[in-house]
């Protein structure tokens, strides 16, 4: 059986993860660092192109073997690209950095100017602009909400609270975001939200954020594209601008430029780089 595009030393472990029965389904594996630049090292993702879909359990096994925070799986069927995203704890419903890394891989391989990925949750469009990639994402309405009692003491400094897919705490300063101390055990108890985001204005031209999703195995995400679906529309309104920059204050850091595309969508511009050696 062939494991095309794999470094030899990684081929056998991945075959074992598939019980030696499906190795030929894997066409190519890459690792991309996404949302890099401006002293930010971004968020790594695995990108796997498959000849066809494997079972959910096999995709999850491969994700664990690849060992990145998220792995994007792509198929190319009847001229259409399809995508699914898996974190270490299982499948997730939308991943910005996984989408952009997958887009960078496909645009390079097929020499395309843009690519449309079809997913269970709608289309994701990736394009290349100079040294940046663009990712069109939905704009999520900010709905006022109460702080769940499980984390009420974590929100004592919040100056605003709202919800989308995620729970968002708006803090008074960049320093407050940097110094925020989460509690993974209590965050796992908030069943109605995907993750907790803390954010603050960063002058008049942008904002900062941190993103916590222990329910899906991500204690603190390094750089989160989908968080901009929640934050960009809020800060467009608050800061009176349709184009902002965002910085994620994680251990490695993430850098984004965001623009309002329509009333229902935003565009995220960012850099992504393929690692010199694929796994």
Curated annotation (Swiss-Prot):
Keywords associated with the record: Isomerase
Pfam families in the record: PhzC-PhzF
Broad EC category: isomerase
Single GO BP term: biosynthetic process
One of the record's GO molecular function terms: isomerase activity
Superkingdom: Bacteria
Gene3D superfamilies: Diaminopimelate Epimerase, Chain A, domain 1
GO cellular component, one term: cytoplasm
EC number, UniProt record: 5.1.-.-
InterPro entries for the chain: Phenazine_PhzF-like (IPR003719)
Family: Belongs to the PhzF family.
NCBIfam families: super_attC_Vc_1
Name of the protein: Uncharacterized isomerase VC_A0395
Naturally occurring in which organism (per UniProt): Vibrio cholerae serotype O1 (strain ATCC 39315 / El Tor Inaba N16961)
């Amino acid at each position: 059986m062939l494991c095309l595009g794999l470094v030899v030393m990684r081929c056998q472990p991945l075959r074992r993860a598939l019980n030696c029965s499906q190795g030929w389904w894997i066409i190519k594996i890459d690792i991309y660092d996404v949302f890099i630049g401006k002293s930010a090292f971004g968020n790594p993702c695995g990108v796997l192109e498959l000849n066809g879909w494997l079972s959910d359990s096999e995709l999850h096994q491969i994700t664990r073997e690849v060992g990145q925070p998220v792995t994007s799986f792509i198929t190319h069927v009847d001229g259409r690209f399809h995508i699914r995203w898996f974190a270490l704890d299982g499948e997730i419903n939308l991943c910005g950095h996984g989408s952009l890394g997958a887009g960078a891989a496909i645009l390079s391989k097929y020499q395309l100017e843009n690519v449309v990925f079809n997913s269970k949750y709608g289309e994701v469009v990736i394009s290349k602009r100079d040294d940046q990639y663009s990712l069109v994402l939905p704009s999520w309405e900010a709905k006022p909400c109460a702080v769940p009692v499980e984390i009420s003491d974590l929100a004592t400094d919040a100056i605003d609270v709202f919800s989308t897919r995620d729970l968002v705490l708006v803090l008074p300063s960049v320093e407050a975001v940097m110094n925020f101390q989460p509690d993974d055990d209590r965050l796992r108890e908030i069943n109605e939200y995907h993750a907790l985001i803390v954010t603050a204005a960063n002058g008049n031209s942008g904002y900062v954020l941190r993103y916590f999703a222990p329910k899906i195995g991500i204690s603190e995400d390094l750089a989160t594209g989908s968080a901009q679906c929640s934050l960009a529309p809020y800060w467009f309104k608050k800061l009176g601008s349709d184009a902002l920059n965002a910085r994620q204050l994680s251990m490695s850091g993430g850098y984004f430029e965001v623009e309002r595309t329509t009333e229902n969508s935003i565009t995220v511009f960012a850099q992504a780089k393929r690692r010199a050696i694929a796994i």
